[in-house]
Amino acid sequence: MEKLDRYLQEHFDVPAKNPSEEAQRRWRQAVGTIVKNRRRRFRWVPDLDRRSLDKAKVRSTQEKIRVALYVQQAALIFSDDELALITSKHDSKALKMHGGVDGISKKVRSSFDHGICASDLDTRQNIYGVNRYAEKPSRSFWMFVWDAFQDMTLIILMVCALLSVAVGLATEGWPKGMYDGLGIILSIFLVVMVTAVSDYKQSLQFKELDNEKKKIFIHVTRDGRRQKISIYDLVVGDIVHLSIGDQVPADGLYIHGYSLLIDESSLSGESDPVYVSQDKPFILAGTKVQDGSAKMIVTAVGMRTEWGKLMSTLSEGGEDETPLQVKLNGVATVIGKIGLVFAILTFLVLLVRFLIDKGMTVGLLKWYSTDALTIVNYFATAVTIIVVAVPEGLPLAVTLSLAFAMKKLMNDKALVRHLSACETMGSAGTICTDKTGTLTTNYMVVDKIWISEVSKSVTSNTISGELNSVVSSRTLSLLLQGIFENTSAEVVKEKDGKQTVLGTPTERAILEFGLGLEGVHDAEYSACTKVKVEPFNSVKKKMAVLISLPSGTSRWFCKGASEIILQMCDMMVDGDGNAIPLSEAQRKNILDTINSFASDALRTLCLAYKEVDDDIDDNADSPTSGFTLIAIFGIKDPVRPGVKDAVKTCMSAGITVRMVTGDNINTAKAIAKECGILTEDGVAIEGPEFHSKSPEEMRDLIPNIQVMARSLPLDKHTLVTNLRGMFDEVVSVTGDGTNDAPALHEADIGLAMGIAGTEVAKESADVIVLDDNFTTIINVARWGRAVYINIQKFVQFQLTVNIVALVINFVSACITGSAPLTAVQLLWVNMIMDTLGALALATEPPNDEMMKRPPVRKGESFITKVMWRNIMGQSLYQLFVLGALMFGGESLLNIKGADSKSIINTLIFNSFVFCQVFNEINSREMQKINVFRGIISNWIFIAVIAATVAFQVVIIEFLGTFASTVPLNWQHWLLSVGLGSISLIVGVILKCIPVGSGETSATPNGYRPLANGPDDI
């Protein structure tokens, strides 16, 4: 009861308004020593006896309140997690002691039918806690700053900078002696802060996306209404509705249900599922509903569940490196080693030339502090060359591009769960998609019905009268009983009193059809008792219910795929409601009706019944023969707007769309033709036929398969496995059911449906399509291609900078004995190249041209011949320009005077930076001449370019003391900008040069252009 005591003390204890009695007695004694007159004395002190009496009355009142609250809230109290332990420890004895599940329900003030009162939520959360797990605190911004400081090359540079400051102060005094070192320190600080800000913003973005992943909703009964709430709002006492594919959101006890099978492998590690019943009612959070449905009462939430304790111990390990990041890390390592060699050679050349000059002038035995400063600066330059050469911006660019794409896709209703999925989707060559809800709207209505050998089109106003005119009341009664008893949908009342049907789209359509007929509220239906329920799943393709009739007999109702149910029937209901034998001619007519419905793109479902003996085994499965056919439903599910254009886009992008559905083959073919998936050369096949093929037959068949109907989840898995294994395809697969999990896991990219998908399917997927729309899947592919191409653009840009910076400093060191680009200047270039360059180029949005080329195949080179052509061409131009300025600048520009060398070095630095600025613009298009297309709409790119130019002006004109530059006149500025802008002309010339034959040469940007393709995309 300690927790209740704390709760009552916190909320209902009445603190004394005046000081404590002991303090008042001390005050009385003090007053007594000063005020001798007793009458006057007691004006200054209270009557303690009366006060004690008043306090006694207050205590008495409080005790009464406590007793009342104990009595009132005793129904909500269990000592020391006792309620949670009953479920987590599977304590049957304790459960029995409390009166079973019914007793627990009463003790937590809940009702199986009405649930809890919403007004109790705060009280329940205060006592039992909230349904959230303890999460590790997010990393602060300063932790990212610390991480950025851990770069070894920056640490070495910092040491060099401090040495430079120390030696400079000793030789040149304050403040001139510290300029060089302080310039390096400020540059390091700037690099660290920009890196930290970038990483911190990305972490916030990924955390936001992670929070989106955790948004899970569940159906509960509260205040007598069934409603949908977030799992985080669950409290003890809630009545939760579970169905196939759900992840159990809290610990609870089974109330009632049908064939509930729970997968506890996530907690126990046991692969065998557990049957849950009233004899074994314990259901644990984190487990998954493998089959069946049920209602449970919540007994523990959040950190009081075993799942909560387990989740709180798991640290966020972050994302694994994506395949592209791994590949680029290899590239970065090679470039870094080359940079290290150049840095060592540059330092050795500078040192040797310095020693030779010193030996020839003052001798090697005389050393001054200025000599030490020179060597320190040489070493700093060498280390900075390593900083520039090591392209740590490559993995950063990938992460930045993926994060940007993920954010945009989130706005487009696609939640990317794994980073690698986004880039992999850009290489997808096949999309295996479901039909229902993905290609179609998933808003279903009964459009036609066949009953007693009569087909009728359904209209809400006339169908009741039309059916009454062609069938007897007994036939109609059987139809309605089959609809209302054999359904997983439910009619609920909203707050405004209106009725709403909850359930899957198919179940809703049939139940709404039944509600539109007369006789809905007949007492006969409510008098029936459900004995056994077999929920629908994608393997059986049917659902069944066994009911006990008021007459004492029992009856099975079965509903499902038309061909399967028809095979189970040997009788049919005639117009008078009698069961008559089903002749072969009638069976053929029924099949023709099914095919006719399917050819109109209608989903077909059959409803049948079977009378059974009263002594049937309740645990036996539903029979597979001897049924009597009642009706066939033709359900309309229109194709989504935009799907046909999306499929056309896929074709022009070299992506094959294959429909894999459990529907009738004629329905599937009709929808596939309407969407543009099924072509004249395409193959439509049924799952059983596909599964019977040999590997050799599959090898010939699979490339042409465009539609697979009546397929099982295993058939989808087999198709995906063979596409990846036999044809080395990058395959993406959509799925919504629990049984789709193996195919989603096997595919390169698993796409789960956010609306129709189960939690099991979502957990197995890489991307969750929040609106279940096929067009959204194409957007994922577009952004995947954009990520790949954007990284190629950045690599092209960065390698150009690397080559020029390394060569120009090395050649200058060899010939002149000095490096024109100082450590501070190289650090600024490094920031332009790594962080700002990645930000500018990695965030380019996709364009339509990307979807007019086939995808990159596995094993293709990341750096294409087109990229090498651009890199080498731009590098040669920049080396020529900078070399001309270095060796002939003074004479060519007629620069004379004591500061001529400083002006030339500043001009070299300024021209070098502007070459990178214009080459960054050049890199927006690797093959197209027009590099300005769409640049106005990309504000990030414009902002980066503007910031680079603005800061370059500040460095040259105002920070010369730190950056070793001098102010330039307007002619020199014009020259620098002009030399940089010529990079655009060089880019145009380079793009006119063919790059040779071969596979790569025919694949600009890594993609092979299609010979033909629609232009209106």
From Swiss-Prot:
Coiled coil stretches, renumbered: none
Residues binding Mg(2+): 736, 740
Activity regulation summary: Activated by calmodulin.
Cytoplasmic side: 1-153, 198-228, 352-384, 824-825, 896-938, 994-1017
Keyword Transmembrane helix (UniProt): yes
Gene3D superfamilies xref list: 1.20.5.170, Calcium-transporting ATPase, cytoplasmic domain N (3.40.1110.10), Calcium-transporting ATPase, cytoplasmic transduction domain A (2.70.150.10), Calcium-transporting ATPase, transmembrane domain (1.20.1110.10), HAD superfamily/HAD-like (3.40.50.1000)
Reactions the enzyme catalyzes: Ca(2+)(in) + ATP + H2O = Ca(2+)(out) + ADP + phosphate + H(+)
EC number: 7.2.2.10
Main location as per UniProt: membrane
Active site per database record: 434
Subcellular compartments: Membrane
Membrane topology: Multi-pass membrane protein
Catalytic EC class: translocase
GO cellular component term, pick one: intracellular membrane-bounded organelle
Listed Pfam families: CaATP_NAI, Cation_ATPase, Cation_ATPase_C, Cation_ATPase_N, E1-E2_ATPase, Hydrolase
Record's keyword annotation contains Nucleus: no
Spans traversing the lipid bilayer: 154-174, 177-197, 229-249, 331-351, 385-405, 803-823, 826-846, 875-895, 939-959, 973-993
Keyword field: ATP-binding, Calcium, Calcium transport, Calmodulin-binding, Ion transport, Magnesium, Membrane, Metal-binding, Nucleotide-binding, Phosphoprotein, Translocase, Transmembrane, Transmembrane helix, Transport
Matches recorded under SMART domains: Cation_ATPase_N (SM00831)
One GO MF term: calmodulin binding
Similarity-based family: Belongs to the cation transport ATPase (P-type) (TC 3.A.3) family. Type IIB subfamily.
NCBIfam families per UniProt: ATPase-IIB_Ca, ATPase_P-type
Role noted for this protein: This magnesium-dependent enzyme catalyzes the hydrolysis of ATP coupled with the translocation of calcium from the cytosol out of the cell, into the endoplasmic reticulum, or into organelles.
Comment, domains: The N-terminus contains an autoinhibitory calmodulin-binding domain, which binds calmodulin in a calcium-dependent fashion.
UniProt name for this protein: Probable calcium-transporting ATPase 8, plasma membrane-type
Native organism taxonomy: Eukaryota, Viridiplantae, Streptophyta, Embryophyta, Tracheophyta
